[in-house]
């Protein structure tokens, strides 16, 4: 009966149309092979990571508005706006008379144009595609866009260093790492916005060239280096790390034609391209920071020559003699060349910032203007934990795996990681440079660990075991039983460790999101605080003051302030400034520092010599804003005293302590900066239960409440007293 039913069933099925096998409903045709599934999964993950890296940097736009952050980005925005309106030729030959009065500044020869040109190209492309956006919006979103591009480079770099898994993990880690997000949020329109992408791209292309020996990859790395040179002065790190890496490979006996092709092409073409940047020019072959790369380049030619001679000679003793003579001659010639070049002035000495990286105390002792910048300070341990979280612990594990599988590529990433972490410890700003290396090495640790643990889960558990064995076979059977019994424990341990790994990664994601939202997405030009009832208070005093300058002062008015605010005054106030954030002329900045730290009569003479019309100071005594000019005042004294010996720091201290209360020094209580900040402040009650004139930023009652101004008059004070502007009176008539 069953035999008859089967044919009937088959016939009935044959008469019905098979919808699943038709061309429209065929799912079999959609079935992908294993490699295709992996490719689709990789592309999907990278797409999600790309989007994640972009949207994670938009907190500031959502919380505030689309605006430029910090100080330097305002100069970059102003120059980009000029480029898009006037064209590249005018931009390249632009003399800016609104900065560094009366000296002015040649813009084209004193900046790295890569960021501006990149944003302008994006803007012109969008306009060509009929997306009519303002250049400011392009500038605001340039950093998130290139951060997303950096995740793709991190993926390919990790894949080249280790495997596909390491590349994917590296892309995820760097997408949300606070160490990178700190300088790539929306509105952070600074050189690092594109420079970190260029840095990682150059390293990836160079390692690819070393691994393959391909001339095309070597040339690509040279163009990547050119883009890095055009974008940021941190290119010096590349031109010193790559030769150091090549030198290590030569010393360890890893010389190869692949290395020869990669380095020579990258150095020669990269050098020629870099010299086209006016700000770099012949420094690439004359400054001390670049001499190491040239020395390694010449050493490579000696290695190649010796390798060729060794191939031609059959006599080992003769080659050893020739080797000693050649090496000795090369060392002597190189030493003489360096000595003559240095003595003649052809080779310029290292810059102060380069010295400060090798000796952290150098800037404080010799160049206080470098030490005065907060991002040039040494890094605290808490900053590493804040910016890296669990990557601090994954980094050593990644180094272990790299040393375990040592290749030309892993040697490079180890050197990159160790050197960049050292420099990050010397200067907090360079945490940004170390972040890609930390993420890549940590990704290797995560990928290798997960791969080892999942391999334990894939092991097949034996079901049958031999019950009885005799003779020599009994010991073999017992060992099998022991192994089989240990497998469940290994699998349980692997599962527990995997859960722990993913838990730590989830905590890393939560930490990164919190840091991004709370610490790195607040523009310094608009301040925010929480009120007594938890309500959000916005202090928009900076833009209020700059708007007042733009609307209420003459177009040719000269504004004197500390150099921190120069770029913002020029970009938003559209007025001429005495000094700004370029800090190229230490004497000019010292003159402003001398004026701020002098008595009013002496300061007035200095201001008249500079044709100053208005003086702007930042004061946080009312709101508790600690980054004001009073807290920066000692740097003004140090920088001014470095050029003008009449300014002495001990005159402003009491027993080595900086004070603004009644115990402050007479010079401090009567200097121009003190007067301008605390003028009329003695009449103001800032906090309940505190006397009038209580400074909330320093937590003391000021020492001089009866301040009278003779040569200046108050022109404008913002609603929260954060920015105060004073008009310089014309000289009185004299008989």
Curated annotation (Swiss-Prot):
Dolichyl diphosphooligosaccharide binds at residues 429, 567. A motif (DXD motif 2) lies at residues 190-192. Keywords: Endoplasmic reticulum, Glycoprotein, Glycosyltransferase, Magnesium, Manganese, Membrane, Metal-binding, Transferase, Transmembrane, Transmembrane helix. Residues 562-564 are annotated as: Interacts with target acceptor peptide in protein substrate. Glycans are attached at residues 574, 581, 585. Disruption phenotype: No visible phenotype. GO terms for molecular function: dolichyl-diphosphooligosaccharide-protein glycotransferase activity; metal ion binding. Pfam families: STT3. GO terms for cellular component: endoplasmic reticulum; endoplasmic reticulum membrane; nucleus. Expressed preferentially in the root but also in the shoot. Residues 60-142, 182-192, 230-234, 283-290, 348-380, 427-430, 516-735 are lumenal. The keyword Amino-acid biosynthesis does not apply. Coiled coil: none annotated. Pathway: Protein modification; protein glycosylation. Residues 1-38, 162-163, 213-214, 252-256, 311-326, 404-409, 453-494 are cytoplasmic. Its cofactor is Mg(2+); Mn(2+). Mn(2+) binds at residues 72, 190, 192. A motif (WWDYG motif) lies at residues 562-566. A motif (DXD motif 1) lies at residues 70-72. A motif (DK motif) lies at residues 629-636. Belongs to the STT3 family. Component of the oligosaccharyltransferase (OST) complex. This is Dolichyl-diphosphooligosaccharide--protein glycosyltransferase subunit STT3B.
